[in-house]
Amino acid sequence: MNVLFISPHFPSHFYHFCAELKALGANVLGVGDAPYESIGENCRTALTEYYKVGSLEDYDAVHRAAAFFIHKYGRIDFVESQNEYWLATEAKLREDFNVKTGFRPANLEAVKYKSRMKAGYERAGVKTARYLVVEGLGAASGAALRRFARECGYPLIAKPDNGVGAANTYKIDSSAALKDFIASKPESVPYIIE
């Protein structure tokens, strides 16, 4: 089994994923933009091989790394990372190299957008918090948000609908905090409010 692991060293304490794959007999093929020497020893010893690219943002370079590994080790069975940021890169690699496991670009939105995840949970019968997606914060969106706050009460949690981790997450616990959020939220970033 060949596992292409993007940025295998990040976060540093997640090397266990690579180590356990290796223990199961997998070739763990790392692609990253960090110098090999800077990767923790636990991660380095878990990798079969590491291919350094100038930047993981350079899809062509990552694609060439995957092609190199395929030429050397055979078909890639899994493309993984431990960083939500690389979901689109993983999906494109799966599509380009016909990897049968994992999300492809066409179905990536179901796991990338919090509002779409909630729709999936609801279809599966999993209860979720009531929510509102706010695309921009013009007068109509501000009014809808204030109405949502009146109906649901405080506190509300606001976070980017498409975002990594808890970055730019707000706890709104009063009408004054809601007013501040409306005034400061970037117009171009869709937010999900729960």
Regions found by a protein language model. Name each.
Residues 65-69, 147-148, 181-184:
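CheY-like receiver
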Residues 1-106, 138-139:
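ATP-binding N-terminal substructure of ATP-dependent carboxylate-amine bond-forming enzymes
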Residues 25, 76, 151-155, 188:
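A general structural motif
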Residues 61, 141-144, 177:
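Short acidic active-site motifs
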Residues 95-169:
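A conserved helix-loop-beta module that forms one wall/lid of the active-site cleft
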Residues 15-22, 118, 145-146, 179-182:
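Short amphipathic alpha-helical segments and helix-helix/interface helices
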Residues 127-129, 155-158, 167-194:
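Conserved ATP-binding module of the ATP-grasp superfamily
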